[in-house]
Amino acid sequence: MSTVAIVDFGSQVTQLIARRVRELGVYSEVFPPSTDFQAMASRGIKIDAFILSGGPNSVQQLHGVPNAVSDVLNLNLQKGVPVLGICYGFQMLAHYFGADVAQSVAREFGRAWLDVIEPSSITEGVWSLGSKVDVWMSHSDSIVGEVPQGFRVVARSADTGAVAFMCNDERKIYGVQFHPEVAHTPGGREMLDNFLKIAGCTRDWTMGSFLHTQIGAIKSATDGGRVVAAISGGVDSSVASVLVHKAIGERLVCVFVDTGLLRKGEASVVRDLFVGKLNMHVNVLDKSALFMQRLAGVQDPEVKRKIIGETFIEVFEQEAKSLGDIKFLMQGTIYPDVIESGVGESGTKIKSHHNVGGLPEIMNLSLVEPLRHLFKDEVRLLGKELGLPSAILDRHPFPGPGLAVRIMGEVTAERVELLREIDNIYIDMMRDSGLYDHIWQAFAVLVPVRTVGVMGDGRTYGYVCALRAVTSSDGMTADCFPFGETDERKLEFLAFLQKVSRAIVSNLQGVNRVVYDMTSKPPATIEWE
């Protein structure tokens, strides 16, 4: 199986490069700039192509070249491994080979136009010689003067004349100032496809091949040891647990912790799904009192996540001891969790996830995270490959910390119960209306702000609740629903929201105002905390 290594210099869209390559049938993995690729090669680990990502820094600030870049270009020289640099990666290549890179007089952000002045195997079938093409730019630095020796210019900015695409055909090194991985660059997917053809990559990465590889990896990693699985009933932990069960069978022990922060009737739903449909035994632990006690008086969302993560691990360590010789803890961590938590060296932390940033530094169980490098849509595809029912795979994402991060401010028993009922009304009505399967994720948020209202002849003073519904494919970007729908569809959804608002206010004491969150991701995250 071919592998493309992506060196991550901190771009918030690095994961999109990985997704695009995988969509083209080639396995890709993201590595930090400190990676020793020469050592990997000496151990027989074969990389078929390298992509250097964009990033927020400037090559003018560099004190020497990152180890990974030196390794990549040495492997290119020694073994002919093709290299593609994108944005900062392009500037890094130019800098490495001796070109001057400096801050641009005119920076380019967003849509930009290029003049195509030379042909290239990367743009074959995509751009025509002499044409003007639009791309997506996001950069402050540019090459000043000539491109490095051995390189030629394929395209320049129509506005500034700056080099936008250079290549060294003999060494199969390509640098683009724009972002071919984003949807805003027409033909970007085809350019990446051409790069993979140049690298001679085989198109054999599928969920079937991933499943086969992971089963072997799980068997090897656990080495006959027993694993306790943290399941929630959500898509990620369900797929992960079924995958691990397929690999090691009864050595997997599934544990469901009722934190008191879950959706209405969640424990019963989990029992029905795992025992009734998957024939897997589940130990249910009611730890709601413990979690509520630990969260008392806490308002900061990062502190809440940290407390929940630490308490989860504590509970599982205790359960592992009671079960006997348990050495591993399985979690349903997926790639967006890792990216948003800023675990990589160059990434910017957005918020911690209890599966990642919420973990204590010292833990007595080794982690098994079989989905760590998969995006949400890939997890669902893997679930289908494993034969999981749609009742599991079609569920909307639910955060590990549960309702605690959908209650702004302090978490109290009263607020949890109120939000649980609000959310249940919203989701039940969404299912009844036929909207549920058209929406990536929908939920309610309780805002600790009280507003004045009137019901009957009396004054009310209740909480505000916010409703959210978004469309997405992988959770990395999202639009509020019904963005992009027809005007008729938008009016229908507005009428639906009015019905939900009336149902919430009429049936629940404590809420007298309902609002709808119209924000996309970015600039917001999907969850409020």
UniProtKB/Swiss-Prot annotation:
Q: Note whether DNA repair occurs among the keywords.
A: no
Q: What does this protein do?
A: Catalyzes the synthesis of GMP from XMP.
Q: Which Pfam families match?
A: GATase, GMP_synt_C
Q: What terms describe the molecular function in GO for this protein? A: ATP binding; GMP synthase activity
What's its catalytic activity? XMP + L-glutamine + ATP + H2O = GMP + L-glutamate + AMP + diphosphate + 2 H(+)
Active-site residues, record numbering mapped to chain:
C87, H179, E181
Record-annotated residues binding ATP?
S232, G233, G234, V235, D236, S237, S238
tRNA processing in keyword set: no
EC assignment: 6.3.5.2
InterPro entries per the UniProt record, alphabetical: Class_I_gatase-like (IPR029062), GATASE (IPR017926), GMP_synth_C (IPR001674), GMP_synth_GATase (IPR004739), GMP_synthase (IPR022955), GMPS_ATP_PPase_dom (IPR025777), Rossmann-like_a/b/a_fold (IPR014729)
Q: Which GO terms describe its cellular component?
A: cytosol
**What HAMAP family does UniProt report for this protein, alphabetically?**
GMP_synthase
Protein's name in the database = GMP synthase [glutamine-hydrolyzing]
Q: Which CDD domains match?
A: GATase1_GMP_Synthase, GMP_synthase_C
**Record's subunit section:** Homodimer.
According to the entry, every stretch annotated as the Glutamine amidotransferase type-1 domain falls at: 3-204
Q: GMPS ATP-PPase domain location, by residue?
A: 205-395
* Keywords attached to this entry: ATP-binding, Glutamine amidotransferase, GMP biosynthesis, Ligase, Nucleotide-binding, Purine biosynthesis
Name its pathway.
Purine metabolism; GMP biosynthesis; GMP from XMP (L-Gln route): step 1/1
Q: Encoded by which gene?
A: guaA
